């Protein structure tokens, strides 16, 4: 991997969507995500109604780089060498003595020192982006509730209910208001079945009032994307969001003609598997009316696709650029889903979009209050304030500032640094 990054040297520029090109209004979207899951757990799975009440102080628990041990409900923060820096059982922080007794100076049980990455992904969940963080708070409060109800319960099995909540709120069919199917009976008459979709709380709310939860993209970013295309760059949009939700986000943030900005759009990419899985494991699918159709043995032309893999994509990029080794850079906000897999498996250059670099509106870095004094979500009169975490300037010329270059190179050299230091 090159130690010096030049955007001008790249043939292909790819982007994630959520929290990268699409900036969310986090003080509104975070409670929406939390409530989407909490209501499902209370209504469908019988969890304590106290989960529905969140105080401003509760949000201070949210912190990037937490790993949840799915068996015992413990959240840990790892050092680069795999030792545990701090931990909490649910939301209850362990004292230094408790931490020493539970973990000592040994590597965490799921950490593999030769790769520098945790193993056994079915045993833990890693929270490294703002879409997931409300779920971390919910899981911690679930662990608190179960511990209280069951007199110090040590092991848990609530993760299956969290997964069910994810499926309910974010499955591919959840975005659609209705699904129409037809069936012919023996008398050759047709019956039309109308199945109500629009599941959960999240998608209906976003569709009802997108301006409450999303920020439009600055014109400077649109201009920059157009300049990249004019300079002969191939532009990619690779998102794990489904096709219909991707359209809603892009139309609101980039405009109705957003598709003209990109040569290839890939939705439901199922990252990080898009980068790590083989073509046979993750083929591309065509789309019709936002629903997946036939699988493709290869990717032969630009367009809009679903799922897929970076290997077949790269073969297409070779044809489009007429180069045996086109250079690709990918912008994303998640170390787990974007930065590490794109760099490690696909050998792409990567740029981490780190919202925290901005600080407060109008403040110089040296004047800003230290981050350790602040939670990730600021409140006033019981309501999360509109703190400007994302800097779209990172997607313009300042993407090549010394600060971001330093951050990117450090991440490429030490892919677990986010766990310990973010």
List PLM regions with ranges.
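HAD-like aspartate-dependent phosphatase fold
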Residues: 1-422
């Amino acid at each position: 991997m090159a130690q010096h990054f030049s955007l001008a040297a790249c043939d292909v520029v790819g982007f994630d969507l959520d929290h990268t090109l699409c900036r969310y209004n986090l003080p509104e979207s975070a409670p929406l995500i939390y409530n989407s899951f909490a209501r499902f757990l209370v209504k469908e799975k019988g969890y304590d109604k106290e989960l529905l009440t969140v105080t401003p102080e509760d949000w201070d628990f949210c912190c990037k780089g937490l790993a949840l041990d799915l068996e015992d409900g413990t959240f840990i923060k790892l050092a680069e060498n795999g030792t545990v820096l701090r931990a909490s059982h649910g939301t209850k922080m362990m004292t230094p003595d408790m931490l020493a007794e539970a973990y000592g100076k040994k590597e965490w049980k799921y950490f593999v020192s030769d790769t520098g990455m945790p193993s056994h992904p079915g045993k833990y969940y890693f929270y490294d982006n703002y879409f997931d963080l409300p779920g971390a708070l919910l899981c911690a409060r679930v662990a608190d509730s179960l511990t209280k109800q069951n007199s110090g319960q040590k092991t848990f099995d609530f993760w299956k209910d969290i997964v069910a909540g994810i499926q309910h709120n974010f499955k591919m069919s959840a975005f659609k208001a209705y699904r129409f199917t037809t069936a012919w009976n023996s008398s050759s008459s047709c019956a039309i079945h109308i199945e109500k979709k629009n599941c959960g709380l999240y998608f209906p709310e976003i569709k009802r009032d997108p301006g409450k939860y999303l920020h439009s993209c600055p014109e400077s970013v649109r201009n920059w994307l157009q300049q990249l295309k004019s300079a002969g760059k191939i532009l990619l949009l690779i998102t794990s969001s489904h096709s219909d939700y991707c359209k809603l986000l892009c139309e609101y943030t980039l405009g109705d003609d957003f598709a003209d900005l990109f040569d290839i759009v890939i939705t439901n990419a199922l990252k990080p598997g898009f980068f790590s899985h083989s073509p046979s494991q993750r083929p591309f699918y065509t789309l019709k009316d936002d629903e997946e159709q036939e699988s493709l043995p290869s990717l032969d032309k630009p367009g809009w696709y679903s799922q897929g893999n970076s290997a077949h994509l790269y073969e297409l990029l070779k044809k489009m650029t007429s180069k045996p080794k086109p250079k690709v850079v990918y912008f994303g906000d998640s170390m787990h889903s974007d930065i590490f897999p794109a760099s490690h498996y696909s050998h792409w250059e990567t740029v981490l979009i780190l919202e925290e670099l901005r600080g407060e509106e109008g403040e110089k870095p040296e004047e800003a209050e230290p981050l350790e004094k602040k939670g990730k979500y600021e409140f006033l009169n019981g309501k999360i304030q509109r703190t400007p975490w994302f800097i779209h300037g990172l997607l313009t010329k300042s993407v090549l500032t010394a600060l971001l270059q330093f951050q990117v190179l450090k991440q490429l050299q030490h892919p677990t640094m986010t766990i310990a230091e973010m």
